[in-house]
From Swiss-Prot:
This is Copalyl diphosphate synthase 1, chloroplastic. The gene is CPS1. Its cofactor is Mg(2+). One of its GO terms (molecular function) is terpene synthase activity. It comes from Isodon rubescens (Rabdosia rubescens). Residues 1-72 form a transit peptide.
Amino acid sequence: MASLSTMHLINHSPASRRRIMSAAAAAAAKLHLPECFTITKSAWMNNTENLTLNYQLNHKKISKVAGINRVATVDAPQVHDQDDSTENQGHDAVNNIEDPIEYIRTLLRTTGDGRISVSPYDTAWVALIKDLNGRDAPEFPSSLEWIVRNQLDDGSWGDDKFFCVYDRLVNTIACVVALRSWNVHDDKLKRGVTYIKENVEKLRDGNVEHMTCGFEVVFTALLQRAKCLGIEDLPYDSPLIQEIYHSRQQKLNRIPMEMMHKVPTSLLFSLEGLENLEWERLLKLQSADGSFLTSPSSTAFAFMQTKDEKCYQFIKNTVETFNGGAPHTYPVDVFGRLWAVDRLQRLGISRFFESEIAECLAHIHKFWTEKGVFSGRESEFCDIDDTSMGIRLLRMHGYDVDPNVLRNFKKDDNFSCYGGQMIESPSPIYNLYRASQLRFPGEEILEDANKFAYNFLQEKLANNQILDKWVISKHLPDEIKLGMEMPWYATLPRVEARYYLQYYAGSGDVWIGKTLYRMPEISNDTYHELAKTDFKRCQAQHQFEWIYMQEWYESCNVEEFGISRKELLLAYFLATASIFELEKTKERIAWAKSQIISKMITSFFNNHNTSSEEKLAFLTDFRNSNGLNNTNMVLATLTQFLEGFNRYTSHQLKNAWGEWLAKLQQGEGDGAADAELLTNTLNICAGHIAFREEILSHNEYTTLSNLTSKICQQLSQIQNEKKMEIEGQMTAETSIKNKELEQDMQTLVKLVLGKSSGINRNIKKTFLAVAKTYYYRAYHDAQTIDTHMFKVLFEPVV
């Protein structure tokens, strides 16, 4: 029989080892589906949503891999132990991940105030500031030079890779005004004017969701400046422009002028478009860095009106940082770090950057306030988007965060991105929804947030209203739809990563502020390439392991115990979708084998043909370590599994399995006992227990174990009832929305994510990982699980 102990290639010479791995890798390259896992060609070619996977359960063995012992291919560390020889050249790209990892590490370590693209609009406002010594020249000539250098071929200014009419027009009018103010580059000015005149009517067809922030207010304010400067040929009196003026006036009439002078509001972001401002009062709302709500254009306008020194220093620092340019908002240290961590986690590559992520989140926690956070640190104004992302990520990493901070964004039964928001957008509410799923018992604000966000997003999806006002992302509707179909409890890490590989656009995502902008810490092609390469490497390893698992299935005659290949595949998939890292072969195989072996033993004990004497003999031989020489296939399989580890690990495993067998003998073998056995097996095999066996009886460990067992028992019951309902045997009486189950899951999440009283965090995470696989099986139907298995284990990553 195949065993883990035979998986190591230590006894092979380096040359032999390379030949073995090369042949195995070549086999993996061809292996898309195992023989027992087939799919109709038409269904796959059409990429239908209702993809069905038909298992052909046969007794054929997978063909030998070029005469190589397939067991050897499961040695995880050897997968990337290859040289530059010709036979391995086809796999060099897959294994060469050090360069992108180092690039991303450097990117994260040097984030500073955040990286963001320059805004021509804001740069133009900075260029309007007159020389402080009275000369007829700009105070920041480098800003004017930036404008001159960055006009696009069509005469406009703006994002050169994505066309948004609002972005192009507001940038272009601002740059035209700046050029005329200093009477320079008349040729560029005329080309800009021509562009505005020829394209302004496109506003009628523009997506209102993609309208840049405050467009009606700031665009018309700049048109007025252009008119005062005598710029001719602009469509000042066109019907469309008059409509925009009307919209501006309506918006200005709604502004609570008294309120905006008292407390920080979003209006501080666009002061350059407002009238009748009381600057003495507004200066009291200035941010600590001298800006008005991190906006260079708003701050530049404020400086023109007040000559405030703090405003000047903010502008000067920004211009120096961006070589004459100015972004639409700065700093973006909070926003950049939060979304970078989120992207790396969802792409499944965060493990390469643990120390960098820890530093990012420590930075966020340092600037966390009772109001929440904003895109830049030390802001009195906060928003629900950054705050929700902060709650979720900080909580996931063990920080104590009070979710009641979300009450700042709640009015009646509704939540909004910030006070005074006119049109609510999907992406911030989706992040609120994601945060609300990590709730602890008694957190009513997260329960309210969950209900609101769920209903809001379902309505948006139903009405096909997923265009967002903060980000232009091709796959945002798919991402939100999947998030609604797969709640966090029922989401496994590798399934999430596989889908997010499809949805993440890298540098293709464009963000919307006063202008369009891009952020390399968030939208980065290197993230995407590394994630795809890493997924391919892991998937190849998983396919090696799956070959091995089928060999083991055959050699142990598992099918004789009523366990199908499909059940074997499901057991291995659940392990792989939860613990996917290359180096964790041992844990994956232990997970899958323990699930199958426990079923074999249960089948043996529950078989009416098994006598009491045979059961007693089984237990006696197990206790006496007399398994390998026993004719009982079940006991031999169990013994071989337990002896595939070092002596101390085998001893701990035998104790854990002995306790489970005792419960089985007493008729207590159920989902609870199985879950307890699995978590103990995983923690022991992973080395979390090591020489500290007392951990297994630690109060926190037993609390986690008992709660996880209870949850898994409930979920097993739900799953069994669902299966029987499908077969027409009964109507399911237990719902996965059971209130007690929800409370138990919340308690488990709190125990795992909260502060520990002596138990390693990795040990606690094992309990949650196991519970989530039970939840996953109870929540999703068989067809959905089949699709996930195919995508994670066999579908090539393009």
